[in-house]
């Protein structure tokens, strides 16, 4: 929650695609009069891609220091705070390709909730041509 600024729903047309970008970078969008990159988070994490037939996107705006990103996701169900003692290592629980982008995971009944590491997402080599 420390890095989350807002969860919003935006029309697909509000994202302007940019040429020669990795597939996970959808393009640029306007958020509160600021131009920010929109990222297809499932694509970036090698998960199931967004439904291309959508008319609107669910976006989670994150800020890490001075960097703002719009993380586009399939669905936003809500937010939950967890006690630190409930957070477990994701190693062995999820695909190894996801681990660098996670702070941990929480086991809840029949599902594993993944806690994203916003700093790791922003600093990902996938998003930078350095």
Feature-to-residue mapping (PLM):
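An acidic, low-aromatic, low-complexity terminal/linker signal
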Residues: 1-130
